[in-house]
């Protein structure tokens, strides 16, 4: 019964793996809910900043911020948001495939590329392809803080404000629902004019700003862009935990199927062994009776 013992060992091994994937699935469910709450909580902040900036811009049409001007530089920037860990299905692979297409377009046009990596997977990818990484941040944990993101992101924002970049793209995975996540490569800078328009029917106001409206707009637009990056990180984190939950559930289900198949093979092997032993006993008894 050496074969039977080997099969029992395989069953035990797969059962242990199933326990691990089930535990990871449950942990991902909890983290996913918290990440979704953070993602939803971040939206009103950036929307309120956008509304204030839009009203200020309407009241001061003569002023245009550097983030809204188009530059003629032959260089673009990428902020790539990925996870720090794996085991989340094709989440990072799908995003990096979309990023690769955009990078190739830029390279074929002779445009220089500067990148900021948020997350270990994106940093590893950029290092492997030999991309120029001007800043990075990893190991944000389950509760990302804006102060950790500001430094690396500011590198590209300052470069754009100085006219060194013609565009900055934000690459992340947008959370649609628990089952679906969508990889996006969106233009962050220059800010689209329609993104800072006062919505139809929205009440506008004319406050007095100190020290002056221009200073407030300068500060608000920087905060607005930073909030968009934070929102992307929150969306990506919710997508990560959702994808990991789905992947671990699939792994748990597959482990269950493998266990059932191994048990079937074990029972067949055991039955064959018993049948063989009975045949030998019957043959031996018949031979003894014949003697």
Curated annotation (Swiss-Prot):
It is a peripheral membrane protein. Its main location: membrane. The keyword Glycoprotein does not apply. InterPro entries: ATP_synth_F1_ATPase_gsu, ATP_synth_F1_gsu, ATP_synth_F1_gsu_CS. One of its GO terms (biological process) is proton motive force-driven plasma membrane ATP synthesis. Gene3D superfamilies: 3.40.1380.10, ATP synthase, gamma subunit, helix hairpin domain (1.10.287.80). GO terms for molecular function: ATP binding; proton-transporting ATP synthase activity, rotational mechanism. Keywords: ATP synthesis, Cell inner membrane, Cell membrane, CF(1), Hydrogen ion transport, Ion transport, Membrane, Transport. One of its GO terms (cellular component) is plasma membrane. Pfam families: ATP-synt. It is found in: Cell inner membrane. The keyword Chloroplast does not apply. It comes from the Bacteria. Produces ATP from ADP in the presence of a proton gradient across the membrane. The gamma chain is believed to be important in regulating ATPase activity and the flow of protons through the CF(0) complex. Belongs to the ATPase gamma chain family. F-type ATPases have 2 components, CF(1) - the catalytic core - and CF(0) - the membrane proton channel. CF(1) has five subunits: alpha(3), beta(3), gamma(1), delta(1), epsilon(1). CF(0) has three main subunits: a, b and c. This is ATP synthase gamma chain. It comes from Variovorax paradoxus (strain S110). The lineage of its organism: Bacteria, Pseudomonadati, Pseudomonadota, Betaproteobacteria, Burkholderiales. The gene is atpG.
